[in-house]
């Protein structure tokens, strides 16, 4: 299993994920600056913030499958080359339509998540997969990097130049992956149709997809809507809002490998049930909060639970679907990405309908309860003997 290469490839792929997520999430933290030059209404804003998630979710299935066919090296390399185009186009954007188009293709940066979660387990023994995938998942910190750094840099050199600077970083990592990516990565050539046929009859795939829809969806959604939400609802300064959003993302990211470790040492489903109970409480807190202090407590609770939950779920995926890991990773991670697409739209709709976003957070709690019920069913069926 090429374990001797594991540490190096894990590091390279994790850093590549950081860069991919930096590009994927670049619009949201810069939107307070972009909106000064490009006029957008609330409806357009919610679409612009959510649209990178569409392609970033849909492509996760073919990217996971392709990783098993041609290896992570070439999927990462081609993705970085493709990303150069929407980044360049975004730097020239002058209309909402241009923002939407560039944002759509920035989704490639989010889709590469399924590359590593398919490739990395090949280099490690089963009792280390949870930790390894958790470390790889820390590449999500790329979202926080953009949240922390993009706003203050944009305040100095302008948002267009800030966006264009990403071209250099992406080009460097395309070169690094071309040179150092593992061309001898073990391949798994199981026909996609047969994988889907086997997966479609396994209820665990649907449960894991629902759980990740909530945990990773919360991670993505909060990262997308928090900067503008904090500015518009609490009067927070643009840079401060970016920092607060970055803290949410960083906390969830650094706790992801802890979730993987907990999944390696204990029953991952049981730990996940506890995690979701706390997440439900956090969602209820957000649903009743009207003060920044209470809202912060709710956000931090969601961040902690989302991070741990992400790590726990991707401990379970390879253990349940060893031979269909590429397709399973792609489907589950796709659902997680889609989980980040809907909340910003729901929040905008609910706020316009009721004058408050509180109901949207209560809906998160309801989804958490539904997921908890399915966890109880799986635990009873698989472990309670």
UniProtKB/Swiss-Prot annotation:
It is found in: Cell membrane. InterPro entries: MFS, MFS_dom, MFS_trans_sf, NO3_transporter. It is a multi-pass membrane protein. One of its GO terms (cellular component) is plasma membrane. PROSITE patterns: MFS. GO terms for biological process: nitrate assimilation. It holds the Pfam family MFS_1. Keywords: Cell membrane, Membrane, Nitrate assimilation, Transmembrane, Transmembrane helix, Transport. The chain crosses the membrane at residues 14-34, 47-67, 69-89, 97-117, 139-159, 161-181, 205-225, 246-266, 277-297, 302-322, 330-350, 359-379. Induction: Positively regulated by the two-component system NreB/NreC. GO terms for molecular function: nitrate transmembrane transporter activity. Belongs to the major facilitator superfamily. Nitrate/nitrite porter (TC 2.A.1.8) family. Probably required for nitrate uptake under anoxic conditions. Also possibly involved in excretion of nitrite produced by the dissimilatory reduction of nitrate. This is Probable nitrate transporter NarT. It comes from Staphylococcus haemolyticus (strain JCSC1435). The gene is narT.
């Amino acid at each position: 299993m090429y374990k001797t290469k594991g540490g190096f490839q894990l590091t390279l792929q994790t850093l590549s994920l950081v860069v991919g997520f930096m590009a994927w999430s670049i619009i949201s933290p810069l939107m307070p600056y972009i909106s000064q030059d490009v006029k957008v209404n609330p409806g357009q804003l919610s679409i612009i913030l959510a649209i990178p998630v569409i392609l970033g979710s849909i492509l996760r299935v073919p990217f996971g499958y392709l990783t098993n066919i041609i290896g992570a090296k070439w999927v990462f390399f081609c993705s970085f080359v493709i990303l150069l185009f929407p980044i360049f186009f975004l730097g020239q954007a002058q209309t909402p339509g241009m923002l939407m188009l560039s944002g759509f293709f920035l989704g490639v940066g989010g889709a590469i998540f399924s590359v590593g979660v398919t490739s990395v387990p090949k280099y490690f023994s089963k009792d280390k997969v949870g930790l390894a995938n958790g470390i790889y998942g820390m590449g999500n910190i790329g979202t926080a990097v953009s949240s922390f750094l993009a706003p203050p840099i944009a305040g100095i050199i302008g948002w267009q130049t800030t966006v264009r600077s990403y071209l250099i970083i992406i080009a460097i990592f395309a070169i690094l992956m071309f040179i150092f990516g593992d061309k001898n990565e073990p391949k798994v050539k199981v026909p996609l149709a047969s994988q889907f046929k086997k997966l479609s009859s396994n209820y665990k795939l649907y449960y894991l997809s629902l759980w990740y829809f909530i945990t990773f969806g919360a991670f993505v959604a909060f990262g997308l809507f928090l900067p503008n939400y904090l500015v518009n609802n609490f009067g927070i300064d643009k840079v401060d809002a970016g920092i607060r959003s970055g803290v949410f993302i960083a906390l969830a990211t650094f706790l992801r490998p802890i979730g993987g470790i907990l999944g390696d040492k204990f029953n991952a489903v049981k730990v996940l049930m506890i995690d979701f109970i706390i997440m439900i409480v956090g969602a209820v807190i957000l649903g009743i909060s009207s003060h920044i202090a209470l809202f912060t407590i709710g956000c931090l609770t969601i961040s902690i639970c989302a991070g741990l939950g992400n790590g726990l779920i991707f401990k379970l995926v390879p253990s349940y679907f060893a031979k269909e890991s590429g397709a399973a990773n792609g489907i589950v991670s796709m659902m997680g990405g889609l989980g980040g697409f809907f909340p910003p739209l729901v929040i905008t709709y609910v706020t316009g309908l009721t004058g408050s976003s509180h109901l949207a957070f209560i809906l998160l709690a309801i989804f958490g309860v539904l997921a908890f019920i399915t966890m109880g069913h799986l635990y009873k069926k698989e472990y309670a003997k």
